[in-house]
Structure formats: structure tokens, C-alpha cells
Regions:
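Short, flexible segments with low predicted structural confidence
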Residues: 41-42, 67, 115-116
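A structural signal for well-ordered alpha-helical scaffolds and beta->alpha junctions
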Residues: 44, 188-189
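Glycine-rich phosphate-binding loops that contact phosphosugars or nucleotide phosphates
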Residues: 71-187
Length: 189
């Protein structure tokens, strides 16, 4: 932070937040000059393109392998990092509940470690992270594996999280201009 001319990290974070607050972009392709019809076309068009690309990326055998692990598990804990991944973990928990599975969405790093300590060989940790590099999530996944649990990662390929997983569900979408995880990432996950 000091190398950028700030007194400390606090001042740097404040300046960054103020700068991002001035940015009116809600999507990488949308500009202030766009009318409503153009905004709709840009956002829905790029989302549709991302989903079409995802359709070609997903491996049905990988999804079957993940489904088998989930079906056999006595407990499924969904770990997430950040707002977008938290929404996805909550959604997955709800869907698993409807299938009669014992599932929990856990967003807090310390609670993830506690969960990982008790998952055991009949448990599955589903780790959801678009970037796949958050240290505390990687620590929880490592600990869950040490306890004998299986790990399903929903993340970008070639990330530390993907490399640690028993089953890796790769999700690649273009980055958003403002948010590191944008609309397409949320929908694709």
C-alpha cells in the first residue's frame, strides 16, 4: 500500500472502495451510453454464450462421478468463499435437502475447519470457489481429505483447489470488469 502512495492498508482499501463506487459498470460489456434494449442484449447474450461454452466444457462422466459421491455420502458440507459462491452453496444445500441428503452450506473459514474435522470417510466436501486459490478454503479441503472425506471442487481448471479434488467440475467463464466473479460465473456454477 505504501508503494502506491498510501499511509497504510486501511487508506488503500478506502481509496479502492471509493474508486469502485464511482464505477457505474455492472457488467463488463455495458456502458453508460447503452439504452435498456442494448443492456438486455449484452447481458443476456454474454450469459447465453457462457452457458453454451460451459455445455461443451462439462464432462458427463465427471458429473456422474460427482453424483455418485453425493448419493453415497451420509453428510455433505458445501464450503464457499465470497458472496457469489455463498449463494451457490446455499442453493446446493437446498437442492440436496430436497433429495433427502444431510447437507450444510458453510461460509465461515473456522466452521469449515470444524466441519472438515468431522466429515470422515462417508462425508463429502463440495468446495465452491471461482478463483480456486483462497488459502483458508484450501486448508479446509486438505483437512477434510486427511479425515478420509471425498472432495468435489466446482472451480476453474488448473487451480490449487482443482488439483486437490477427487472430482473436479471445471467452470470457465470470462472475468467481469468490476467484480472478480460476475453474472456468468454465478449462473454457470
Amino acid at each position: 500500500a505504501r508503494q502506491f502512495g498510501f499511509e497504510g492498508v486501511r487508506e488503500f482499501k478506502l481509496a479502492l472502495a471509493q474508486d469502485l463506487g464511482r464505477t457505474s459498470s455492472v457488467h463488463r460489456a455495458v456502458s453508460l451510453e447503452d439504452d435498456c434494449a442494448v443492456v438486455i442484449q449484452k447481458i443476456l447474450g454474454s450469459t447465453a454464450a457462457s452457458l453454451t461454452a460451459l455445455q461443451h466444457q462439462l464432462n458427463p462422466n465427471t458429473l456422474n462421478e460427482a453424483a455418485d459421491l453425493l448419493a453415497q455420502a451420509t453428510r455433505i458440507d458445501c464450503y464457499s468463499v465470497g458472496t457469489t459462491s455463498a449463494f451457490m452453496a446455499d442453493d446446493l444445500q437446498g437442492r440436496l435437502f430436497r433429495l433427502g441428503k444431510a447437507a450444510h452450506a458453510i461460509h465461515d473459514a473456522h466452521k469449515q475447519l470444524i466441519s472438515a474435522a468431522s466429515l470422515g470417510i462417508h462425508g463429502v466436501a463440495v468446495a465452491i470457489s471461482h478463483v480456486g486459490r483462497m488459502p483458508f478454503l484450501l486448508e479446509s479441503v486438505t483437512f477434510a481429505r486427511q479425515q478420509g472425506a471425498k472432495v468435489i471442487a466446482i472451480t476453474q481448471p488448473h487451480t490449487p483447489l482443482a488439483d486437490m479434488a477427487d472430482v473436479e467440475i471445471d467452470v470457465m467463464v470470462p472475468p467481469d470488469a468490476v467484480m472478480r466473479v460476475g453474472t456468468e460465473a454465478y449462473i454457470a456454477h
